[in-house]
Amino acid sequence: IQKYVGNEPFLMTYGDGVCDVEIDKLVEFHKSHGKLATLTAVKMVQDKGVLDITKDQAVRAFREKNASDGAPINAGYMVLQPEVFDLLDGDSCVFEKTALVELANLGQLMSYVHTGFWQCMDNIREKSMLEKLLAENKAPWKKWERTIPEIPDYAK
């Protein structure tokens, strides 16, 4: 994708979560600090890898947490400068274990703290819960209008 990005900042997300982050505010925050990368941070009560964040929102490190930790996690919505491609070692690298860690070590990774809705979709239970919210027109991330399909019986 590097050839399509050119010299412009770009947005990247993982495909396993949904949220109602205001993209324009995320991009505005990214432009305000002059670093190479901004990730969206959310607080949640789950076992996930968490972020050590300074008072000025710089990400200093990544670590594992337990459910009662309370530390924020990477929600997977990012704004990146094209220089981030220099930190990638081909298609086989794991972005969050290589580039994001290196960016944090270099002091080039900032966090945009999101306090709204965020939900991972790592298993069928979470997928079904999100589909139910969508079908019932209670999906906080839904900012568009469209006809919502019925939930299949297996997903209820």
What name fits each language-model region?
Residues 54:
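Extended acidic/charged loop-beta regions that coordinate divalent cations
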